Swiss-Prot record:
Short motif Nuclear localization signal, span: 736-739
Name this protein carries in UniProt: Polymerase basic protein 2
Species, as recorded: Influenza A virus (strain A/Korea/426/1968 H2N2)
Gene: PB2
Superkingdom to which the source organism belongs: Viruses
First-listed, main subcellular location of the protein, grouped into a coarse class: virion
Keywords noted in UniProt: Cap snatching, Eukaryotic host gene expression shutoff by virus, Eukaryotic host transcription shutoff by virus, Host gene expression shutoff by virus, Host mitochondrion, Host nucleus, Host-virus interaction, Inhibition of host innate immune response by virus, Inhibition of host MAVS by virus, Inhibition of host RLR pathway by virus, Inhibition of host RNA polymerase II by virus, mRNA capping, mRNA processing, Viral immunoevasion, Viral transcription, Virion
Amino acid sequence: MERIKELRNLMSQSRTREILTKTTVDHMAIIKKYTSGRQEKNPSLRMKWMMAMKYPITADKRITEMVPERNEQGQTLWSKMSDAGSDRVMVSPLAVTWWNRNGPMTSTVHYPKIYKTYFEKVERLKHGTFGPVHFRNQVKIRRRVDINPGHADLSAKEAQDVIMEVVFPNEVGARILTSESQLTITKEKKEELQDCKISPLMVAYMLERELVRKTRFLPVAGGTSSVYIEVLHLTQGTCWEQMYTPGGEVRNDDVDQSLIIAARNIVRRAAVSADPLASLLEMCHSTQIGGTRMVDILRQNPTEEQAVDICKAAMGLRISSSFSFGGFTFKRTSGSSIKREEEVLTGNLQTLKIRVHEGYEEFTMVGKRATAILRKATRRLVQLIVSGRDEQSIAEAIIVAMVFSQEDCMIKAVRGDLNFVNRANQRLNPMHQLLRHFQKDAKVLFQNWGIEHIDNVMGMIGVLPDMTPSTEMSMRGIRVSKMGVDEYSSTERVVVSIDRFLRVRDQRGNVLLSPEEVSETQGTEKLTITYSSSMMWEINGPESVLVNTYQWIIRNWETVKIQWSQNPTMLYNKMEFEPFQSLVPKAIRGQYSGFVRTLFQQMRDVLGTFDTTQIIKLLPFAAAPPKQSRMQFSSLTVNVRGSGMRILVRGNSPVFNYNKTTKRLTILGKDAGTLTEDPDEGTSGVESAVLRGFLILGKEDRRYGPALSINELSTLAKGEKANVLIGQGDVVLVMKRKRDSSILTDSQTATKRIRMAIN
């Protein structure tokens, strides 16, 4: 109030008013400030001042022919004065209004296509639902998030080439469009943008939004997918949050989510196979996510998640240098250590060999629901500052940090034996043994850790062994903070190596990732994941294994039946029969296999007993290592639907049902495909179904040209000879019969003759 009175007083003196209104602003510093550089120093003032003028806008001279001098109200729309310093005319804001209402209409067909990301955003917001506002302390941590919903995942360079090709197709310059996504997008956009009148520069900007993932390092408390980030300013403040459900999903979020699920499933499956690395690569290469090859997505998608990074490492791609332990991402922020093997005794006097990190180090730990700063020395936790969503999440972080510290009191807190195994039934390494043990029950660990008095520090609070907060006491070195710890912001990627057991190491040999670190969380993928590899058949349970195995046999029947007759051992060892073995009761697998193999051998030896349906039905049972026994079976058991179900050796059953009339096979009531030939030819020898009507003359004869496939035989004229490829690359010479009457005998002799011709 005093100040205002004083100012009023000053202003009442006429001299003051005169000085303030008449004095020229000739102070050099002020003039410099407002006139140097192109940058506007006070944009809002400048705007207000300009708009107060009559003609604040300049326009091309042509405007005078297109816009009348006055509008309906008689207001002047443009001035006859030229703009100083250019050949443009001065225009009133009213001219803009006139133009918007009465100006020429252009086609709007391209707008939704060009401004696609904006139109889609409006739709998402229109259909989104905003819930109540809650006032509470927001623990935000900075995370690298995707700020651009609805984009493809091209690299900046790839996108640049696509944009140049679409917007400036005739510009000179080397552009190589190699990836499938580049070619598809270019073709699609060129078609969409025919006769487009929107300025090329604008089109280029908008295309960039659509093609490239843009990330920012932002403080986030809730969801991190791009449809949440686009409304971040509406959903979380410093002390409030507003519930929001997006009104639509975007493909890039769905790709990220589905990629994580596919990668987890693949790593889990590969870990239990005989050669994890080879299996993992085979699965990554044969899997599609939403119709795109998984390996293409891995090359372009920057998602950082343990399983995804293991897949990337296997493909030789660079990944982040942070490492993972107990589901937390650790990044060393200072210090260093050397590693040394040391033997330690648990509370149960079990000896563990652990790799001890000697030296002082500081780490940030970032998990899904908690974050922390950890300072540690050799086998000693110096300080842990943790923050999390709830008690449970904070406890998880504390356990991981205590185990990671390798302190003696932690190892002594072990009660009972440590014998945790992974999915492949191999013992876990000692650090993961300890982790699993305390994740199951941390009571003794927390009780034995030790308590200390604490100082009152702003924003920090103590935590007792039973996880209750306290301002006086806390577990030694451990504090809970209201502030979160930011995620590691760098996007730097490093070269890594991966061993046969999927352990990923940096170039110094530090383990960054291993299958133990892959989350067991199950989720439902947003996009369809198609695993073509037989290793993934079991992901949907026993029924899926059953159906897939028989579908595979039917799809590959031409090759399968040839192998069946000529190289059965190779056929039995096919990896496609591996998943099926888990359905056959362990105790009897060997006997079933021996029985079926003997039965098949009899079929091969005794002409005329070849029965397609029976071979298909029993083949998967022959894949197990056979036990020789005199046992005969009339039915074989498989474990599906929670109990043993029977497959009849002769005849149909609910599990395996072949309909002779429709030639369709149903497995547990599900359609498994159609057989292309009639399986009920009692006499049909292996190739006979195919070679009826041909006489087998003997070994290949080069004079009759290159070998034809069985399907090409139909083109031969009667009496014509040709070489034909049968089986695994065996070639025999045949002649098309002149008379049809003798066709029947071919069936019986074909098998014998093929064998003789080959041998």
